[in-house]
Amino acid sequence: MGWIQLQLSTTPDLAPEIESLLEAHHSLAITLVDAADQPVFEPARGETPLWDSIILTALFPNTINPEELIQNLNQDYHPKKLPPLEFRLLEDEDWERTWMDNFKPMRFGENLWICPSWATTPEPEAINIMLDPGLAFGTGTHPTTALCLSWLDRQNLKDKHLIDYGCGSGILGIAALLLGARQVIGVDNDPQALTASRSNCEKNQLDLKNFPVYLPKEFVRQINLKAIQPVDLLLANILAGPLIELAAYLAALVRSDGEILLSGILEDQAESVQEAYAPW
């Protein structure tokens, strides 16, 4: 079994109407992607911004007649005219195997590797983090995660205490523990991230007591109970907006002689983030 793929170029004002039209004609899936490499960062709460130029792709069963579908779509969209439509046949394949083949071991710095569980570790004597793509952000493929991992690989983390604020999959915390840290505390506002962090910790034969993870409210409660003390190093690979907003709060979690590693920042946001943390 294969699929018929329909693709067209559109704009933000037309996209919702065309989506509805395709859904009415029994599309199986619809995807919108950026047609011009235009970044959209940190939308306001409740907003779902789209790019100025969009490529819309829809999948249909391979039993449809593309010519009939085009005719019906144009008829239902009349008197307006649809953008040019392109069709192609997608052959069926082992999608899970294809996905696995595209996720290979990655090296960060001199000694650190991220390896999927189905792959052979290229350097068994190196520090290998076993990690599969899953519920939460963080596999090493994102540039900001890669930067953080490479930086961690260069540090002396022996017996240090860390906080990973926005821990996602737990990748940075696990790397720190395998590089010698004594304890990492993970914080994330997504319950699935906490589940993923715990699972990945166990997959790497690490004791969960050395990587406790909390939702932000529970983390604050632990601080108020004085169960959490200022740490040697705080990692925060999130976004510039939250980093600036939380500057005083995050800085207070670090010892006076400690360090803060901030990432997830665009080049033109760096100065604003630096200014927010300058008092500390």
Identify the role of each PLM range.
Residues 2-123:
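N-terminal auxiliary segments of SAM/dcSAM-dependent transferases
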Residues 135-218, 227:
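Conserved SAM/SAH cofactor-binding pocket of Class I
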Residues 155, 189-280:
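S-adenosylmethionine
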Residues 110-112, 160, 258:
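Surface-exposed loop/turn positions
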Residues 127-133:
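A short, charged helix-loop
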